[in-house]
Amino acid sequence: MSNEPPPPYPGGPTAPLLEEKSGAPLTPGRTSPAVMQPPPGMPLPSADIAPPPYEPPGQPVPQPGFVPPHMNADGTYMPAGFYPPPGPHPPMGYYPPGPYPPGPYPGPGGHTATVLVPSGAATTVTVLQGEIFEGAPVQTVCPHCQQAITTKISYEIGLMNFVLGFFCCFMGCDLGCCLIPCLINDFKDVTHTCPSCKAYICTYKRLC
């Protein structure tokens, strides 16, 4: 065996440094930064194209003319739990005073009616409602002459007189006693007529 030293190691300190693809040699302790290269056939992005601005989630896009419930009309925010005070309202049953147009307002128990007279002029006549024609004169308006009158009454023999006469005969009251009910006005029917034009108005029957 010879005593010559072994040849130098290929990766020893005397080996030449490796070069990057760009041609710059790598220094000891420094690594090449990773560069993202687009795949073949895809163009590089332009520097003028910027990503869209970031919008935080949960913010709805306001509609034109819409005012959120927590925002006033002038754009200011109201604190949570705050509600504007209600406007003034009149109490129930209150009617504000004011001028009312004049008109023919009927009184209690009556209504107004317009009657055309032969001359062609319109005349307003008040007809009383709810009048009860009984055994006494009644104040009303004559439907014929349109005058406010008090009716004239007259008595006529009616059904109640005949019923009482037959009852007297059944009880044995004969010899003309059965005719006594026909002489009593409280048992007769009452006819109401107009004292002005003598027209018939109504008949009150004691017994229908």
Swiss-Prot record:
Domain of life of the native organism: Eukaryota
Region listing for Disordered, in residue ranges: 1-70
Main location: membrane
Places the protein is found: Late endosome membrane; Lysosome membrane
Binding-site list for Zn(2+): 142, 145, 194, 197
Residues of the LITAF domain: 122-206
This protein's GO CC annotations: cytoplasmic side of late endosome membrane; cytoplasmic side of lysosomal membrane; nucleus
Region Membrane-binding amphipathic helix: start-end pairs: 164-184
Swiss-Prot/TrEMBL keywords: Apoptosis, Endosome, Lysosome, Membrane, Metal-binding, Zinc
GO biological process, one term: apoptotic process
Name the UniProt record assigns to this protein: Cell death-inducing p53-target protein 1
Origin species: Mus musculus
Lineage: Eukaryota, Metazoa, Chordata, Craniata, Vertebrata
Gene name of this polypeptide: Cdip1
